[in-house]
């Protein structure tokens, strides 16, 4: 359904979302799995002098990762709880796009251990929540 404003023009901010079958996105050519992360970090180090590794927590589909990339960071790990967000992130970015629940201490410890195997991390960023998708913990 298309909504019109008071003067009869289409209001683009009131379009009704259409949900259809999901689309499978191919992973980025430089994407890796969580257990492959230290090897991916070593590969980036071999190709770039002094890379600035970053981690994007609560990444969503990758808006903050894009900004970090444009600021010359290499986002080696992005984490989000939503599968569709992670699939979109994995399609657009190299590194590891990891679907996980960061409210679980065990998960956070596993991530910390894996990052310790990667060497120096320059930045850990946490994206602001998208309120309609956030849940109360």
What residues fall within each predicted segment?
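Conserved active-site and SAM-binding loop architecture
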Residues: 1-137
């Amino acid at each position: 359904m298309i909504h019109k404003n008071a003067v009869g023009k289409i209001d683009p901010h009131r379009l009704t979302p259409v949900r259809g079958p999901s689309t499978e996105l191919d992973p980025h050519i430089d994407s890796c799995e969580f257990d492959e992360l230290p090897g991916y970090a070593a590969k980036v180090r071999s190709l770039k002098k002094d890379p600035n590794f970053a981690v994007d927590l609560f990444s969503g589909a990758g808006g903050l990762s894009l900004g970090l990339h444009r600021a010359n960071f290499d986002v080696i790990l992005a984490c989000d709880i939503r599968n569709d967000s992670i699939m979109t992130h994995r399609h657009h970015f190299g590194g590891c796009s990891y679907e996980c629940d960061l409210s679980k201490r065990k998960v956070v410890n596993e991530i910390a251990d894996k990052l310790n195997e990667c060497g120096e991390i320059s930045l850990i960023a946490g994206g602001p929540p998208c309120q309609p998708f956030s849940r109360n913990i």
